[in-house]
Amino acid sequence: MADDLRVRLHEVLSAHDPQRVDMPEARDAAVLIPIVAVPEPTLIFTVRTDTLSSHKGQISFPGGAIDATDPSPEAAALRETQEELGLDPASVEVLGELDTTPTFVTGYLVFPFVGWIERPPALDPNPAEVKEVLEVPITDLSGRIRREPGFEHRGRSYPTEAWVWNDYVIWGVTARLIRQFLDKVAATGYVEAPGDTTSWGAWPAPSAPS
C-alpha cells in the first residue's frame, strides 16, 4: 500500500506544473513535507520553539529561508530539515513540488517539496528550533478542515483555515500547504479530498499571523 502511494504520488506530482507567485519583495523559503512510509504513511511536523524570531510556537513543516549558497530551493529544504531534525538528505526521495505559497504578513514565499522516507528515521531535533516533533498519519487529516472567518492584523483581514489533531491546532501557511498536499494525495485514491467543516467546536485563537 505504501509503495503504491509513493509511485502514484510521484506520478501526480510529476504531472503538476508548480505555480509561482510573483512576490519580488518577499524572502524566499523552502520546506519539506516529509512522509514516512511505515508503519503507515505519516507526516512529520515540528512545533517551533517560542524563542524563534518568526512563527514562534507554531506547528510547521521543517524548512526555512533559502540562503545564497543553496544551489536550489529543493536543496534548501533538505538542508533546513537536516539542521532542524538531523534527517540525512540521502534518506529522502523528493517526489515533487507544490505551488509556492506566501505567508500573509511575515513576508516569506514558501517553496514546498514532498519527500518520501522509506524507513522510520532516527531524528535528532535541534532544541534551539524544535520544541516537539509530531508524527501525523495522512489518513488522520483526510477529508477534514476547519475554516474560520479570519483574523485582523494591523488593519487587514486574513482568511484562516486549520486542522485540529489531538488538540494541536495546525493553521496558517502550514494548513494551506496541507490542503495542497492532500489534494494531490486524493488524486492517487489514497484519501478523500479536504472538506470544509465547522462542526468541531471552538479552538484556540492563533497567537500570531502566518
Roles of regions detected by a PLM:
Residues 125-157:
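Amphipathic alpha-helical blocks and their helix-capping loop/short-beta junctions
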Residues 1-60, 65-121, 130, 151-153, ...:
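N-terminal leader/linker segments that precede catalytic domains of diphosphate-processing enzymes
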